[in-house]
Amino acid sequence: MEGPEIKFAEAVLDNGKYGTRTVRFEAGRLAQQAQGAVAAYLDEDTMLLSATSVGKHPKDNFDFFPLTIDVEERSYAAGKIPGSFFRREGRPSTEAILVCRLIDRPLRPSFITGLRNEVQVVITVLSIAPDEFYDSLAINAASASSMLSGIPFSGPIAGVRLALIGDQWVVFPKHSQLKEAVFDITVAGRVVTDAQGNEDVAIMMVEAEATEGAWDLIQAGATKPDEAVVAQGLEAAKPFIRQLVAAQASLAQQAAKPTVDYPVFLPYAQQSYDAVSALALEELGTVYRIADKIERQDADDALKTRTKEAVAAKVEAGELPQSALTEFSAAYKSVTKTVVRGRILRDGIRMDGRGLADIRPLDAEVQVIPRVHGSAIFQRGETQILGVTTLNMLKMEQQIDSLSPVTKKRFMTHYNFPPYSTGETGRVGSPKRREIGHGFLAERALVPVLPSREDFPYAIRQVSEALGSNGSTSMGSVCASTLSLLNAGVPLRAPVAGIAMGLVSDTVDGQVRYAALTDILGAEDALGDMDFKVAGTSEFVTAIQLDTKLDGIPTSVLDGALKQAKEARTAILGVLNQAIDAPDEMAPTAPRVISVNIPVDKIGELIGPKGKTINAIQDETGADISIEEDGAVYIGAVDGPSAEAARAQVNAIANPTNPEVGESFLGTVVKIATFGAFVSLLPGKDGLLHISEVRKLAGGKRVENVEDVLGVGQKILVEITKIDDRGKLSLAPVMEEAADQEGSAAASDGPEAPAEG
């Protein structure tokens, strides 16, 4: 039987001395009933299947495009069996959720405006090499399958990940290569043609961060990822994006279905827009000069109600069609957008009266909650973030079961966005995709400045509570987290601040004019063209996230926005520094963690049979002990003496000084035998007090049962009398101590007997 005809296209990306990476797209063999399906390969071992499906009928009463992106990680792709109880995949991993967001952001604005048929793109990870990322490949696969589906789609969209290793941007780097890199950037874009017929790559999405080892590499002389270097990275992505766009276009020419004429529901008719504009345009100009958010919203709601009533009256009078009522909200929003954007581009003034580069009033405060290990509040205008830091033993770090080679994470950042932060009601509970994404962005911004595990052996959980929201709570979370971590005593290598940039664009005199906005409001985010978040230290950028509603943004515009963001970040860092300029002393409620290194071959001895030895140390000292595979032992306790006592016992076992004949120890009787008593001198070091030596404690009298003289748990001062070839210790009592213990031992009332030979 003859199989299906397979169409393919590929792009070979040249990394110079780092070799080449081959991305291959295939169609026709898999998922043949989906409207569009593509198998995407990265070299030979990593394979994804992307399937794009579309519903047969438009969704009723939807005023948005119902697009769903799902990433299905299959454990078999990495040769694993899931670690869950049922041994099958369950809810998506955090990594899968983040990849969903990464794909959604450039794809969503590329579908035709007004589409209301449900579209679902499912990316299944079928195979992955142990050292590979699959996220950038997934962007290309999703775009390619959408290109083949027959849905009106302004692709292709290509995505690439680049790492700055030395002075070279390496495309599709491996996990192991990031150890040599100072910056890691993922860029999605498309090829556009201007009015003069010139082609360029327009940037649609950026996700970037300084790597975990960036600080040490920079100190060793590596390139510092400042704004200029980041701009170079955006330029470096363009040739690779062109190649991948060309490969997808080649596949589409071979295998794409004819474009289907799906019904499109435009948000409003021109007649509805004109009616709303005539009724509300002038007064909207006044409303959107009110600086206070609540006052502005109240005035806007009142105007919207009056305008809707006027439109309803016109409909009733037959001056407007019935559809004007259903189109009213979209038309009103569009008129509002015209008013706000026009004032920005024309006068350089924003709705709250600020200039384009002005920041709202800032406030920062630390140690705002009792008993927690670290806390802070950061406020920018009406955006208010509470940051709370919790420290614990490294054994509390997050264990990760995913396709990534990363299996644990000691720094965890969680972001919560309750409905009251915007003065509304809503669902509370498990985090949504947006909250997971915002938390991860703040985490990436801070990871490069965290102390190493060796310098600060703690698991760190950072929680950001959005108590008030009016623009960029994620960047507010970065600032609040910096304050809270310092308040908890975490020795950050440098403070980090973040700022959200916006963009407004329009055609003026035949040319597109752009205005970058610093510290955008929530309304400016909704009515603008871009959300560009930049976090960093005073010296370099640590994290970037870019989303746009446009088909793409020129890199020259992004370069200018980066420089504008640097000025704002510097100002915010000054405010943070005034609140706290160095790590505080650790809170008395925080655990004290100390470390000791032991030989790897001593790990088993320290643990003891079935954990007996280590559990005994923990029970006796009250400390928690965790042991790493490399022999690093971390000891934690709420008070210092407990930790030091545990360290002494660990050293006695794993780093002992060899006992010598003649040394005395205050030991504990741990076992009674017919021939004597075993006395514990140090953890893991026992010696035998022979029955002949026990007689000394009984005044030299014959001892039939050792239990008549000694009991388990009894303290006794002994001296080492002999160490045999196997290291076994023979003990004798020190009689001065024995005299003190006559009350508990069955000693005679007579004088001490002389020692027997």
UniProtKB/Swiss-Prot annotation:
InterPro entries per record: ExoRNase_PH_dom1 (IPR001247), ExoRNase_PH_dom2 (IPR015847), ExoRNase_PH_dom2_sf (IPR036345), GPSI/PNP (IPR014069), KH_dom (IPR004087), KH_dom_type_1 (IPR004088), KH_dom_type_1_sf (IPR036612), NA-bd_OB-fold (IPR012340)
Leader sequence segment: none
EC number, UniProt record: 2.7.7.8
Keyword RNA-binding: yes
Cysteine-cysteine disulfides: none
Residue ranges occupied by any S1 motif domain in the UniProt entry: 662-734
Entry GO terms, CC: cytosol
Binding site for Mg(2+): 525, 531
Keyword Metal-binding belongs to the record: yes
One annotated GO molecular function: 3'-5'-RNA exonuclease activity
Compartments, as annotated in UniProt: Cytoplasm
Region (Disordered), start-end ranges: 736-757
Keywords for this protein: Cytoplasm, Magnesium, Metal-binding, Nucleotidyltransferase, RNA-binding, Transferase
Family: Belongs to the polyribonucleotide nucleotidyltransferase family.
Chain's role: Involved in mRNA degradation. Catalyzes the phosphorolysis of single-stranded polyribonucleotides processively in the 3'- to 5'-direction.
HAMAP family: PNPase (MF_01595)
Name of the protein in its database record: Polyribonucleotide nucleotidyltransferase
Source organism: Clavibacter sepedonicus
